[in-house]
Amino acid sequence: MGKYTKADILRMVKEDDVEFIRLQFTDIFGDLKNVAITSSQIEKALDNKIMFDGSSIEGFADYDTYETFPWRPQQGKVARLICDVYKPDGTPFEGDPRYVLKKALKEAADMGYMMNVGPECEFFLFQTDENGLPTTNTYERASYFDLGPLDFGENARRDMVLTLEQMGFEIEASHHEVAPAQHEIDFKYGEALKTADSIETFKLVVKTIAKKHGLCATFMPKPKYGVCGSGMHMNMSLSKDGKNIFADDNDKLGLSQEAYYFIAGIMEHMREMTAITNPLVNSYKRLVPGYEAPIYIAWSAKNRSPLVRIPSARGAGTRVELRCPDPTANPYLAMAVCLKAGLDGIKRQLPLVPSVDSNIFELTREEKKARHIESLPANLREAVLCMRDSDFMKEALGEHIFTRYTSAKLDEWNEYTRQVTDWEISNYLYKV
């Protein structure tokens, strides 16, 4: 049973003095969209009678996602409801990423599982120019865990945390990250659909509050050369009857057989999934040696160089950390394909290769080959081609999203390859 009923929403809209409601949904690339209505139309929206484009698709509001925006005026407030998208015949729209995740979660539920996810979202705070336009300038030299006055973004980050808490987030920690102007705010893990919704809200809050401080927040994976990029590590676990099924006290690593199968499924399908977890041309500028980002498809409970890490917490906190995703990934699609891969590992009881407890970046090519360690795709084109050839990904995403996503991403790559970059001008113009 949901948290709110229709009567609850109508009452809260009145009590909160809400004048505008944003009916939010997400496109296949993870970009947040909305249709705004006045409070006079809220009952119509709650009865699923709002058309998003005037004819072809309808928004079905998820009552439990009702929140007011704390940064808006407190008289005549603005609230939001996240919507599922349906066709006029009452069937789910195949292009709705939320529907894709719901399908994967239903498959897990049919096996008795519930998925929990805890993301670690990193971002940069840059200066804006005299016209308020974003730059990549920062005048700070702060690094990991530094604080003010070195951390120029401390005040903005604090206001982000307070705003997120007002919107129901349980913030566990916030701190400066490794690169100058880079930050991380961690919120408590939760059920996968709620967490995916929260990631979209998180990004909206971070960008909005940064702008109020005269800054530009960006989730671009690698906005500057020579520094660490921004990731979105995904900590995942499955529970059954309220118990974390990844934990097993009798195992030497404290992991259950289901956990090993789940990891094997992730590793089996990782190259096919990378175009979803790392969706931009720029994503692959982060996935290079020397900047704390994974490149090789391996796992470990002891070091951070592999793709999959098992954090030290055990018991209820036992989880699998996937370290390649970045914050530009569509969270609904990323969680859906990770869950489907893990479930495939469990269903097929895939054997897991031995862990790699040494630094993979120090292994020779021959040593990696002997251990059957593959690399992630080196660029977006390679990732999309891996995805395009995958029956697993077509089934996981559905024909509608699969076809449109791969086509759009190849177009993005082709557009990129036609650009003449500053690096080319600097290295070739005066030499040839």
Where in this protein do the model-derived segments appear?
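Short glycine/proline-enriched loop/turn "hinge" motifs that connect secondary-structure elements
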Residues: 70-77, 115-116, 174-179, 227, ...
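Catalytic-core signal marking the mid-to-C-terminal active-site face
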Residues: 201, 208-211, 215-216, 239-432
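Core alpha/beta catalytic barrel or barrel-like domain that forms the active/cofactor pocket
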Residues: 116-127, 136, 167-187, 217-235, ...
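A generic structural motif
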Residues: 27-29, 86-92, 149, 189-195, ...
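Short, contiguous, pocket-lining structural segments
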Residues: 148-156, 173-179, 191-202, 206, ...
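Active-site-proximal beta-alpha loop/turn segments in soluble metabolic enzymes
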Residues: 137-147, 180-195, 224-229, 241-246
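Short, hydrophobic beta-strand segments
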Residues: 81-87, 183-189, 236
